[in-house]
């Protein structure tokens, strides 16, 4: 249940209204509370009223709307209900209007008795307000003072007339003519010259009844006034009132009020009535309405005797008979000029002398009251009349008239004297006689079963007064209006005046149906204030009627009351709604139209103190009581055992007061001397027979009587008012003795004792101070006690429950606040959680906890929480006041706030400031480490900053960051364009740009790349400069790395094109070298061919495993160095000097020679073994031997002719090498020397170049050794051994098989030189069942030197003539050898041997060679330049036709030696000089072949030994053709046999 209008408790001050609104409009007061109870609340009306009483008492009235489904049937018989309504003249209801009308009645009566007609004048087209004029003149001091002080203009202004129009003089004339005589009469000036009049004489004039005059004035309206608001009374003539308009206007005869059927007032004398009714003149030319057209009474024409009888009572003279007036009341005579004031003319009507006038006017007026209508109505006929009146009055259907319009019109009508509206009101119709509108049991209207619930409903007004909770139920008498409902049938404007209920009881009114009823209410605390205001504003009414407000006949405008600070509230009661008035609350109102209402009184337990107070108030006003309050209390006390404990407790308290008052009064009476007393059952007497004759109080407890006045009683308060007898003659009548009363009170006390104790405990708990408050558990215990002892569900218990429930809710909320944690730091959506309290609410909640009647354990904890929250607010406010707070401090405060489940308004700003602080700190940190401040970081920070709330520091940082980003993007884009520029920018320009970019405190990706590029370029230039300045020949890998680096640097490098050209030349040289040495589709690389072999004896297994990076077979251990070609290549690349590279290659040669020698002897022994080994594996296929087979000259292994390409018969004289040993084309030396010269010209070191130099040196060395061998005599023994046939093959070939080989073409393994002609005619090889098809020189018959020399001859990848010469020498007859010896130059054997021996020792000595190679590295630069610019001599073909031309041959050989020596000694220091012996050796260098042919001429071709000696040989001397010298390696005989013994 919630009231539609809620008001704060306590007195509500009146609105500061200054009266009615503009133009006199009515301003409605504020609305009273409107309650809409739920079904649960509506079930108990008294409990609900108790619940709303604190609110509704403050307004005096309230409205209750039942639940929508609560619709009781209307139980009245509409056709049988009939009543006689009251007549209500609206302008007689309002107090101030009635005072004005009474004044006009007196003025009219005065002039009527003076024989004149009252004429109300018009001033400024307005009717002159005589009442206001008379009052203002009196306030200013009277007529004489106003005239003396000339205040008429001031009075005219106060009356609302415009100044400056001489209105004051007009008003003065009207006052002097109409009001001044009346005031002189009232002051007694007209009677001062007379003796005291005899007022006891009877008069024949009829007593004047003011309220019998229905019309005080007949108004001639102005032309501008609407006719609907101007009317004439039916009996205006009877009042003899004329209106004197200031301007002639047409008399309007339209009278709206005639339709009302107003009854004619009842006159006591019909004859007088007939003689006094005059007809209104209808002539328009006469502006005055004459009430008297008879001739004036004339005294002048009487007889002489009669004239002598009439003399002036004032002057005693009978003169001036024509001025002598005769009183129509007492027949006294007065001169017109002797009267005060004097009369200028003889009145035309009946005239009364001052004495009779005073006697007539001093008669007391009758009390005002309503008249009963002459007609009896039923509901139907009354409704027809009421609807017709409202419809005609407002000229529209009744249901379309707004309630506001009716309300304003009502208050206008009650305040005007110009219009009289009469309505009728069917009020106070007894429901006992005609039946209630609610259904009752045994009623005349049958009720359906579904409507039977309304029979026993507490809201049925027949049940409410007699319910158990109502104390009126203990009154046995049926009091109409209080215990029995009254019915009210209203029409438009019918009203009920200001009043309070009898005994200040409650009242409840239910509007069954019809149009609304408008109510006005004043709270009970302002009742006396209202009474005082009405007495102040209309004191004349209270002179004759002190209890005027109890008569329900007076109303006053609510605006007037509110102007005097009386609180007034209103409401419109619609059909089906209740209006409840509270004790001593004045209320009034009117009906909006035809309706039917029912009302009754009721009294609750809380009313009992007010009821006793009301009786005391009635005693002071001498107002009778409706029932005896003490009688009701005693009746309730006599039933103490069945009373409700709450009622018993309240009655016990009231009874205690009653006993104390009775005890004191009886003691006072005893002291007065009253002795006799007797018991009397007052309840058996009618109420009018036991009233105090003084104060009208109904006596019950006691009374005083006297034998002198039997039947009369006085209460103990008015003992002295009974009679004049002495008190000892009085008799005290009492109902109970004091001893009877105490047991009755004790019975109530016993009944209520347990409850009282409980209630006392409850009250103490509810009203306890802070330090004495009880716990919530104690409150729950009190509730449990009430339930256990079945105490009634009254206000106290409900209040206790409500307080306990509130405390429990508070405890629950407090616990939630104490336990509550914020679930997230930042909420969605934003805003406030619906369950969170603000800090102010928390503060109020803590205050509420301390204001609770009980103590909660959470209160101090919550107070501490509040203190912490307030501390948090202070700290946050302090922190937020700083220009730039720390993010850590903000976060710390926010972390603290997570403990508070409270809405903190600072959190939003703190989160905003935290984001700002974090952002600023991130910006600051990023700016401090400018090297990591990237463009993306700046953009991200700017994007984050854009999303932040506006703040000065943020905006400044944003501006700086945006400026930095703009500059950074500009320079980054510029750096990007510089990097992508074509052609590329120079290093200096880019360095300048980098220097400028370094001043930007940010990380620029392209700028960093540019800076890195500039640094790389500087490093590159530095490396290039260091390479050029070092004096060393650059290594190819270094050049390639420099070129690759230079190409990757986006900077224009001046040296890069030169290096690229140099690298290109090197690659071109390598391609040329590869074409020279490698056959097509060769599986060997150039480096493999040029370097000593590393895969000897493994049949390529090592190489394959090296390519697959797989481990060697088990049992094989990997060598630490030079194990493979990659090791050798790596060693060459790592060598910094040429001498180191030569040493590495020399070591590789020694390993090669040792491995190959071992392999040769192993294969030879395998093939020459006398026992045939079935497990012997030969050939590439590693299978057993099978004819025909061919033997490799170098590795000495046998190969199936089906597995390899065997040489044909025509090629059988040539040396055959297997696929493993045949590695290159073995070009002649003349084709290799240009490669070396071009390499020296290029001045770049590369592994292939080092290998080529070593190969040439090895070739020359081998040539030298071979020539020494050929020139020595040691070769003859070897020749004899080979020629004697000591060496034979194990598998000689048959003739047939040999011939079969003729069809085989020459394989690529055959050498280019030819053996002697008888080589293939030897028969020693043809008797074996197996034949190799190609025989080799035997190994066992050769010396190690020869064997090594032959072996190295095949290892050399150069074709040399010494190889052919050596083989020819070994395989030819001795005669051929001798012939060859003869054809050689003349040289002693000792000299040749010495020379050859010396050279052989120098070449073949590894220690000496390794010692000399580092010395050769220091070759001075001038020699390098000489070698570089030296043109390589063109190879000349050998001219065998000039064998004697030794000079040319020696010159060509010397040139070859110079090239080799220059390459070997380019690293020698500049101060190193050759010895004379070495110089002479270079100058006298000859072909070291044993059988040198000493060719002469410019076209002598040389070939260098590829072995370890590196000696140069004539191609023709060693049997190497130019093609072989170009495609194949050449190893001299000495190198072939030298290393064999050392590797065994």
Curated annotation (Swiss-Prot):
Binds 1 Fe(2+) ion per subunit. There is a cross-link at residues 148, 204, 209, 242, 274, 278, 769, 1450 (Glycyl lysine isopeptide (Lys-Gly) (interchain with G-Cter in SUMO2)). Residues 1297-1314, 1374-1388 have a biased composition (Polar residues). The modification Phosphoserine is found at residues 986, 1328, 1456. Histone demethylase that demethylates 'Lys-4' of histone H3, thereby playing a central role in histone code. Does not demethylate histone H3 'Lys-9' or H3 'Lys-27'. Demethylates trimethylated, dimethylated and monomethylated H3 'Lys-4'. Acts as a transcriptional corepressor for FOXG1B and PAX9. Represses the CLOCK-BMAL1 heterodimer-mediated transcriptional activation of the core clock component PER2. Interacts with FOXG1B, PAX9, MYC, MYCN and RB1. Interacts with HDAC1, HDAC4, HDAC5 and HDAC7. Interacts (via PHD-type 1 zinc finger) with histone H3 unmodified at 'Lys-4'; the interaction is inhibited when histone H3 is methylated at 'Arg-2' or 'Lys-4'. This is Lysine-specific demethylase 5B. It comes from Mus musculus.
